[in-house]
Amino acid sequence: MAIIAIIPEWCKSGRAVPPQPPQTTREFLVVERGVLDYAGAHLSAHLKIIMNPQDNPMGTDGFEFVEYTAPDPEALRALFEKMGFRAVARHRSKNVTLHRQGDINFLINAEPNSFAQQFARDHGGSICAMGFRVRDAALAFKRALELGAEPGPTTAGPMELNIPSIKGIGGSLIYLVDRYGASSIYDIDFRPTDAAADDTSPGLQLIDHLTHNVARGQMDLWSGFYERLFNFREIRYFDIEGKKTGLFSRAMTSPCGKIRIPINESRDDKSQIEEYLREYRGEGIQHIALSSADIYRTVDRLRANGLAFQDTPDTYYDGVDARVTGHQESLAELSRRRILIDGSAQDGILLQIFTTNVIGPIFFEIIQRRGNEGFGEGNFQALFESIELDQIRRGVV
């Protein structure tokens, strides 16, 4: 038997909202395609997660899409073109466009009088929905409602897929999608465009994680939301303190390991989290991390396309060798591109960089993992201080 990875039992049981008895998590195996053939079951070309349904009751299997909206949708289209996300399909009856790169699907919803456009009126440029891949959407939706989730609006037209959704962070929607891969939702509801193959793609591959910014005192509520409905578990907890402000961050992950959501809460009323909440006019998704197999090439391509990145203090690179032992990266190349590095030779290396705010207060992260499954904890302090310095320059704090 070829076992790819064994993910150990996490050390903390979750807290549900409202309080529920703690659940027991079990270890599970990720097994290579073709290894198992129980009862003649057909294994698809994807890796299969074999586990007791109690471990993954919703059958999560990763992100299917992220849906964006804005008062000016053309600004989103221009941004996605700059990031290498070509428009590959358009909805058959609605003003919705699919932009794709690698296994990342971004939707721009500009349909008049839609939930998305009302969301744009409330928040400006924003993320109004995301789609979770699940084993059985109808069963997952039924379970979510039984556990207290609020259903989202039904907007499917004649001969269109009715994809169930529930309300999530800041009133955004979480769609439950069980058609993906070779037979997807886009085959039914979208028509392909004539987009040509792009040899200059920046090489973004997957949604690595996305973060939530929540109001003070709401972290337990939202971590409990994901624990209770999807059986997420906490895998990291951070307490970051700058010169004048600070934040807490709790990183949650799904049983399948493919949906990771750090939840951020401010320690005070002036931090970058509070600034986001004021500008966004509510809680929501702060940034989306997109993975690359070659972050140097990706950053070079994105910069050449005009995408701006957050700066990093020069002093950051002076301490890299002492902090990230045995990393074998060129400090000159890291510094030239302002790429951050974390980890160690033993724990693996993580490379990351953050764009400036590009959709209201929302920004993107570009990340490359070389055996490190963290979130750049060692960089949090440096990044926090960098953003705080910008806040001080702008007179926010």
Where are the predicted features?
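Extended catalytic-interface subdomain
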Residues: I127-A129, E146, P151-G242, R250, ...
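Active-site region of the double-stranded beta-helix
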Residues: K82-R86, H91-V96, R228-K270
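Short hydrophobic alpha-helical segments enriched in small aliphatic residues
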Residues: G14, A39, L43-A45
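An N-terminus-focused feature that recognizes amino-terminal "leader" regions
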Residues: I49-Y180, I185-R191, R216
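N-terminal beta-strand motif that seeds the catalytic metal site of vicinal oxygen chelate
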Residues: L43, L47-P73, I127-M130, D187-S223, ...
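Short, structured motif recognition centered on aromatic/hydrophobic residues
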Residues: G62-V66, F80, F85, H99, ...
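Long compositionally biased, domain-poor regions of proteins
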Residues: I259-I261, R281-G343, D347-T356, I362-R369
